[in-house]
Amino acid sequence: MKRFRKNNLSLQQKTTAFVLCLLLLLSTFCTAQIGKRFPSERKVVKDPITGTELIFLTSTPAGDSKIYPTHAQWTADGEWIIFRSNRARNEALAVNEKTGDMVQVTEGGYTGMLCIAQKSMKLYFMRYATGDTSQRRRGGPLEVIEVDLQRVLADSKTGKMKPASTYQRICGTIPEALGAGGDMALDAEEDVVYFRVGKTEADKHIAPGTKIEGAFGPRNMGAGPAGLMQMNTQTGALKYIVSVPFQIGHVQSNPWVSGEIVFCWETGGKSPQRTWTVKSDGTGLRPLYPEADYEWVTHEAVITKDEVAFAIMGHRKIAGADTTGTAVGGANPGQETAWGPSGTREKPTGLAIVNLRTRQMTITGQTPTGSGLWHVHGSPDGRFAVGDDFSRSLYLIDRQTREMRLLTTGHKATAADHPHPTFSTDGKKIQIQSAMLSADGRSMNICIVPVPEDWLKRGSEK
């Protein structure tokens, strides 16, 4: 009986196998490397309906998507937009608005929101702490990472990149037991980040006797409790903020006022009370806009130092449910009867703006027909508001005169996601994600929609 099996691989075969493995490793490293550059795809396309000149910063089908409107889109210098793309899967890219040059600005993956600092050239995000990037899935402790964008972009331009650790710093680690999600926001002072924690931790801090909410609506979401915590970006120190009896979503900070947080009761649709605000020390918890049962409030976003925009939806038939409804990603979502008697035009609907100080709310505008405005935003100077609708059209509103103008359309209701309009900090342009150039009607690109010059001049004359 043979005790040993002879190795029949020749030296040449072993060498070939080694070389192939080495090439595979090098290929993986190169494709995932921070600072990697991609050629410009920038092109200007004239909207055939409105005549607006659209600036597509990406124009090929590579699975692009923008950051959500609750967060900043541009870097602090106003020159780059951070976005997600399958060009570097599970990594963040920056595109230069003027040249169209693209640069990978993270390495090692991320989860949840990308938080762009507005006082410094920094980017913050979460990632799973395991060193094995192939194992970075749900579960395990999370790290908060800071990226030095200034150094990444400068070294990438000269072709003299250093190891990723040169540009990426671990701010701190969030233990797995906290059940944290990637729903994170950066404070205006950039010294802390806020994030959501899970039911187990939230239950430890909730006031005795608090009624814990169950799921609400047909998507079986919204059950509590949940909580908010913060991490100091310099020391990694963790501090608990508040617990609430419902599911938390859309955590965002006020970019102009330190310590002010806005979040929502997340149900995937209509909520019993959608919008909430709290201070970072846990005080001042209250509904931001106390809503009625018949109001479908959604997609809140801080737009000025004192104001939050949101949509009061008017997408449902007054007589009852519309049987032509689609899933949330389709062209006519939110029609199920389980959402209750909300979202019709029997009551006032439209793009609403509430003042955080006075608590007064005004409706700035609404489309006369169709779904009504859906994802909304506003210019930081208070001059303009913007919203999309189910058809993926984009409407601009003059907040002084209430005049509304169709800016662009044709972005395809079959798109993989919604336009999600977001104003630049100077109030002169709007970023969206668009499937206008997509052959399959789904893949999206990063697009800039300028505010018309005549409207900009009109505003400056007042």
Pin down the residues of each PLM region:
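Blade/loop signatures of beta-propeller domains
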Residues: Q33-I55, N220-A226
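Loop/turn-rich, solvent-exposed surfaces of beta-rich toroidal or solenoidal domains
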Residues: A311-A352, T358-E403
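Beta-strand C-termini and the immediately following turn/loop, strongest in propeller blades
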Residues: I82-A88, Y124-R138, E146-L149, Y194-T200, ...
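Blade-loop segments of beta-propeller domains
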Residues: Y68-H71, A88-D132
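Asp-box/WD-like beta-propeller blade repeats and closely related beta-sheet repeat scaffolds
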Residues: G109-A226, V242-S243
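Multi-bladed beta-propeller domains
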Residues: V45-S65, A94-Y110, Q150-G179, Q230-Q247, ...
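Blade-terminus and WD-like Trp-Asp/Gly-His loop motifs, strongest in beta-propeller folds
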Residues: H71-W80, S85, L114-K122, M126-A129, ...
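Blade-level signature of beta-propeller repeat domains, shared across WD40, Kelch, NHL, RCC1
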Residues: H418-K462
